């Protein structure tokens, strides 16, 4: 089978590849994989088998919630209400949060604290065989005080994870935006971009990491030479490294993988820099990386950056884990690029995004199967990608239980795909955020928008759940 990575329509033909330098660097040969045909023994049509472990009460609630989030005007109304001044009134706020907690929150979130979330992880595993990814649901921090509070919550997450059998838990998740002030991440990203454009530009605070840019990376965020970090900014960056180090150490001691979530391209260079620094520091076990970074396949530079990071990790003999996703900031990325007079960094068509995801998936699976220190979590709600991944694993003869390859979906979404992959023998996990109801509102609104419309992510689940409910009622 031809080993070719990243198709010509996704990555141009380049002459060289370099981790540093202006965007004139290009890959000599396109390393793209011939994708397997999606036909595979992954049956997503037999709803009775897929939802056999789900009680009828859960099916009823899930169907109702997914149906509600598919109605555009209802989603818009809910989003408006959550951000309106009505929420400033105690009575209204308490009423709305109680309703949300008993419906959308319980469907998409794991609990209000780490202990409750750990119990939910065990409950889900015992009833379905699906593992859990535990994540404290806070997203951003504006100052060092908030970062200090958040890192304690992430440490609590690891402590809760330690109480679970290893078979129940896939990993814990940390957001760099919650442990480093946003303004510092933006400044670091600007300086990293400027150094990439001007390799002689010195960054005295910079630690050892892998490449975070490629010839296709968007650099328009930084149009002039940034000021050096102030003493206070350097101090905050050092504190952020210490916070990340503290949670990495606990994960390493407990043998619990740590996934680092991605953000938009304004901040992503700094996040990649910190993720790869921590991978170099803590990924010492050749068979099981501790630190995983996230690759967003909807970005045009995703394949090149993945290739460069992997090449550097192999050079340094550092194992690395990746979580592969499509991406969640399409609208904001397009708006920012347009406002600055540039093309969006996101692929021009959804098919190009699908192709990039599937190519990166095939490439990573090849790497993971050949005994290298690569581990991959294939986070997808796309059934074709699920089928392609299952077929690729079969072609490569991958041991489905070896822990080097895993599929994942969000808790409360794409259950049919999760159950289908699990029935096919794969390790499958659910991304399970936890935290107080009010802090989960932004997350819940995003899930609602993803499910709206007849062709949304939740369409297959809604269809199969209704079919299974009808079958069970008719069987009475």
Swiss-Prot record:
Q: So what does this one do?
A: Converts proline to delta-1-pyrroline-5-carboxylate.
> Which top EC class is named for this enzyme in its record?
oxidoreductase
Question: Could you cite one Gene Ontology molecular function of this protein?
Answer: proline dehydrogenase activity
Report the cofactors: FAD
Say if the entry is tagged with keyword Lyase. Answer: no
Observed effect of gene inactivation: No visible phenotype when grown under normal conditions. No proline hypersensitivity.
| GO terms classed as biological process | proline catabolic process; proline catabolic process to glutamate; response to osmotic stress; response to water deprivation
Name the InterPro entries on file: FAD-linked_oxidoreductase-like, Proline_DH_dom, Proline_oxidase
Please tell me the species this chain comes from.
Arabidopsis thaliana
Annotated organelle transit peptide span: 1-29
Q: Please state the pathway this protein functions in, per its UniProt record.
A: Amino-acid degradation; L-proline degradation into L-glutamate; L-glutamate from L-proline: step 1/2
EC number of the protein? 1.5.5.2
Induction notes from the record:
Down-regulated by high succrose; via the repression of bZIP11. Up-regulated by proline and salt or drought stress.
The protein's gene is named POX2
Query: Tissue expression, per UniProt?
Result: Expressed in the vascular tissue and in the abscission zone of petals, sepals, stamina, pistils and siliques. Not detected in petioles.
Kindly state one GO CC term assigned in the UniProt record. mitochondrion
The entry sums up its family as follows: Belongs to the proline oxidase family.
Record localization: Mitochondrion
- Catalysis performed (reactions): L-proline + a quinone = (S)-1-pyrroline-5-carboxylate + a quinol + H(+)
Q: Which UniProt keywords apply?
A: FAD, Flavoprotein, Mitochondrion, Oxidoreductase, Proline metabolism, Stress response, Transit peptide
- What's the protein name? Proline dehydrogenase 2, mitochondrial
Q: Which Pfam families match?
A: Pro_dh (PF01619)
